[in-house]
Amino acid sequence: MEFLSEKFALKSPPSKNSDFYMGAGGPLEHVMETLDNESFYSKASAGKCVQAFGPLPRAEHHVRLERTSPCQDSSVNYGITKVEGQPLHTELNRAMDNCNSLRMSPVKGMQEKGELDELGDKCDSNVSSSKKRRHRTTFTSLQLEELEKVFQKTHYPDVYVREQLALRTELTEARVQVWFQNRRAKWRKRERYGQIQQAKSHFAATYDISVLPRTDSYPQIQNNLWAGNASGGSVVTSCMLPRDTSSCMTPYSHSPRTDSSYTGFSNHQNQFSHVPLNNFFTDSLLTGATNGHAFETKPEFERRSSSIAVLRMKAKEHTANISWAM
């Protein structure tokens, strides 16, 4: 019991009138009975306990936790005291300010982009200025004469010839080589153009002249026809007929009021229908003889009509020969 009394010693000495007073040699049963009694847990007994033990000391730097729901109050205090001027709080504020300052506005972004573009332009200008600019070389007449002499001998001079030529013309070997390259390109272009022109002229000489119609017989036809018209009759001369005409197509003198007549064949040809060739010539070539109108020649039509007549006559001769053979 001495152990209990030492461990649980009262901080304030109880009075003798209290129920918990225990003398130096007093029994412990009275104390245990009072603990088992229900009156010990009543308000009166609680007041006695407060009087016996005294009020608990409250620390000033602690704050009692309030049982509040996080959903009801967003500013929940979990027992951490907020002291103004605390170093941790100031460091957090500074970090947040730095994060906000890192967010660039569009205006600042555009300014920086413009600065980057200017830097890029400066870099490009520096690179272009560092490149060597090529200048055109102006050759004199003496230099061109020397170069042309060598070009007439060979289009591809070797290094030795180029060096000798460079010494004579007071040029560099590289410029001489470039001149020969350009001269060869010009020569190839001229050769190609000359071949094209030569091919065109050859084609024109071969095909174009044969296509043109022959006009050497037109003046003779006109003169003969005008002469026949003046005499009152028209005569189909031999110049109007093809050269390979058969004997049946003899020149025929036509009077204004004569009837149509047929060419003479053998008696066995009567079974075929014949075309009045003389009327064909007179109707197609000699028009308006009775009325006395001026005669107008149609060379193209005359040539076609004569060729058609010749073909028909050849066909009839062929059929006649076949019938004679049978």
UniProtKB/Swiss-Prot annotation:
GO terms for cellular component: chromatin; Golgi apparatus; nuclear body; nucleoplasm; nucleus; transcription regulator complex. It comes from the Eukaryota. A motif (OAR) lies at residues 306-319. Its main location: nucleus. The keyword Repressor applies. Signal peptide: none annotated. GO terms for biological process: anterior/posterior pattern specification; embryonic limb morphogenesis; embryonic skeletal system morphogenesis; mesenchymal cell development; negative regulation of DNA-templated transcription; negative regulation of transcription by RNA polymerase II; neural tube closure; positive regulation of DNA-templated transcription. GO terms for molecular function: DNA-binding transcription activator activity, RNA polymerase II-specific; DNA-binding transcription factor activity, RNA polymerase II-specific; RNA polymerase II transcription regulatory region sequence-specific DNA binding; sequence-specific double-stranded DNA binding. The modification N6-acetyllysine is found at K131. Residues 132-191 bind DNA. Keywords: Acetylation, Activator, Developmental protein, DNA-binding, Homeobox, Nucleus, Phosphoprotein, Repressor, Transcription, Transcription regulation. Cartilage and cervix tissue. Residues 192-326 are annotated as: Transactivation domain. Acetylated at Lys-131 by EP300; increases interaction with EP300 and stimulates ALX1 transcriptional activity. Transmembrane segments: none annotated. It is found in: Nucleus. The modification Phosphoserine is found at S12, S69, S306. It is linked to Frontonasal dysplasia 3: The term frontonasal dysplasia describes an array of abnormalities affecting the eyes, forehead and nose and linked to midfacial dysraphia. The clinical picture is highly variable. Major findings include true ocular hypertelorism; broadening of the nasal root; median facial cleft affecting the nose and/or upper lip and palate; unilateral or bilateral clefting of the alae nasi; lack of formation of the nasal tip; anterior cranium bifidum occultum; a V-shaped or widow's peak frontal hairline. Belongs to the paired homeobox family. Sequence-specific DNA-binding transcription factor that binds palindromic sequences within promoters and may activate or repress the transcription of a subset of genes. Most probably regulates the expression of genes involved in the development of mesenchyme-derived craniofacial structures. Early on in development, it plays a role in forebrain mesenchyme survival. May also induce epithelial to mesenchymal transition (EMT) through the expression of SNAI1. The OAR motif may negatively regulate DNA-binding and therefore transcriptional activity. It is found in the C-terminal transactivation domain that stimulates transcription. This is ALX homeobox protein 1. It comes from Homo sapiens (Human).
